[in-house]
């Protein structure tokens, strides 16, 4: 019997962008604990860098697929690809957030409607979409982990819309857990 805590477990890691990503550090820990991992990249702009990073650190055979968390079709297609590798998922990491640069600084009062919609969609609603898509595959003791920050509870200068989005993410987490 293996002494690795996650031996035989499958983790889906959403949000690795580079070697400084919190998602990358979590994926390394899960991998070292024995988990089999499946990753995403977000769009062609990040594809080559993410593929190189994942394959150099986790092996050439580790699956990495395109995923646009703002598209239900993309989310569903991603999990169809995941199903080609496994019929169960034990842990899902949601490490995704976005707010347009202009919505992070200055007065929060100047936040535009489009920036608000985009930020909440990508930073918070994506957890709901990913959870719904993975739910049929989740093991009985499965876990979904989402990344937040102090700015969800306290005002942090130059965090503005991201703080509101993280507060929404935390609320989504509570309702999903209920």
Enumerate the predicted regions with their spans.
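Short-chain dehydrogenase/reductase
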Residues: 2-118
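Catalytic loop of short-chain dehydrogenase/reductase
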Residues: 15-24, 97-136, 140-178
């Amino acid at each position: 019997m293996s002494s690795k805590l996650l031996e035989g477990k499958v983790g889906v890691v959403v949000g690795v962008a580079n070697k400084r990503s919190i998602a990358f550090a979590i994926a390394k820990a899960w991998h070292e604990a024995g988990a089999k991992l499946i990753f995403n990249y977000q769009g062609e702009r990040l594809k080559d860098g993410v593929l190189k990073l994942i394959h150099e650190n986790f092996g050439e055979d580790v699956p990495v697929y395109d995923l646009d968390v703002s598209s239900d079709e993309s989310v569903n297609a991603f999990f169809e690809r995941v199903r080609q590798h496994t019929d169960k998922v034990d842990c899902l990491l949601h490490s995704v957030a976005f707010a347009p640069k202009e919505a992070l600084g200055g007065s929060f009062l100047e936040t535009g409607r489009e920036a608000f919609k985009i930020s909440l969609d990508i930073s918070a609603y994506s957890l709901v979409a990913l959870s719904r898509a993975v739910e049929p595959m989740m093991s009985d003791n499965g876990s979904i982990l989402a990344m937040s920050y102090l700015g969800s509870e306290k005002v942090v200068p130059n965090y503005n819309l991201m703080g509101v989005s993280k507060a929404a993410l935390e609320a989504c987490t509570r309702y999903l857990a209920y």
